[in-house]
Swiss-Prot record:
Active-site residues (renumbered): 20 (nucleophile)
Coiled-coil spans in chain: none
Organism classification: Eukaryota, Fungi, Dikarya, Basidiomycota, Agaricomycotina
Protein name per UniProt: Endoglucanase
Enzyme kind, highest EC tier: hydrolase
Protein's cellular compartments: Cell membrane
GO cellular component: plasma membrane
Molecular function GO terms recorded: cellulase activity
Length: 28
């Protein structure tokens, strides 16, 4: 459960971080 959450965070932080950077730049 904890390991799955860690792997999920790793995958989603990479996509989410890049997504927020791109979307944030475009939005602003």
């Amino acid at each position: 459960s904890l390991q799955a959450a860690t792997e999920w965070l790793k995958a989603n932080n990479q996509r989410g971080f890049l997504g927020e950077m791109g979307a944030g730049s475009n939005a602003d």
